[in-house]
Amino acid sequence: MRCGYCMPREVFGSDFHFLPRAELLSFEEISRFVRVAARLGVSKVRLTGGEPLLRKDVPRLVHMLRAIDGVQDIALTTNGLLLAHHAAALGHAGLDRVTVSLDTLDEDLFRSIADTRAPLARVMDGIAAAHEAGLDPVKVNMVVRRGVNDGSVLEMAEHFRGRPEILRLIEFMDVGESNGWRLEEVVPAREMLASIAERWPLRPLSPQPDQGVASRWAYEDGAGEIGVI
């Protein structure tokens, strides 16, 4: 997989020199950093990437972080392709919850956006495995781009309505020169919400202290909630 947002093939090609493995932080170094941060009041930790599940033995790192005084919540963000294999071990190690990046339910579009030959079913299996492992709530992040996958918003909303997952719609953001950000591809949050509310009425939910940057909306018919970032 070569995610077009953070690792497009045209920028990170075969001649790109990645950081040598010997220079990566060890689990012990990561744990030491988190231990210091926890003493300063940090209580929530998120493992992300790149793809964190490409790192060998990530459940061991989760177990080490779980043992640190002051750490109350450990989350992980993943593309979901390896999640089915690791979910049970991650849950057993003490992971609290997981966020899966998924931008469409269309097989061909999924492979195009993710630049992968892996089937969409592997991501869906990973989401199911996360539930079985008790990694709830499972949040599904969808980055929406006009002319790319904005036509998938209603399909995604319909699929995840009434399910335990929380769909979060994300405006296409400029993260530097690598992701080819263009203003004309940005779909404003209000536009995404309006398209969904036209079919399924929504009501705003009161902010929670730990909800982060997302605004939360509930379906008026009780079929769950969505978030917008």
Report the location of each language-model feature.
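Canonical Radical SAM [4Fe-4S] cluster-binding loop centered on the CxxxCxxC motif
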Residues: M1-L25
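A generic structural signal for secondary-structure junctions
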Residues: P8-V11, L95, A114-A118, A197, ...
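A short acidic, helix-capping loop that chelates divalent metal ions and anchors anionic groups
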Residues: G13-F18, D106-A114, G176-G180
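Conserved G/P- and acidic residue-centered "switch" motifs that form tight phosphate/ATP-binding loops
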Residues: E51
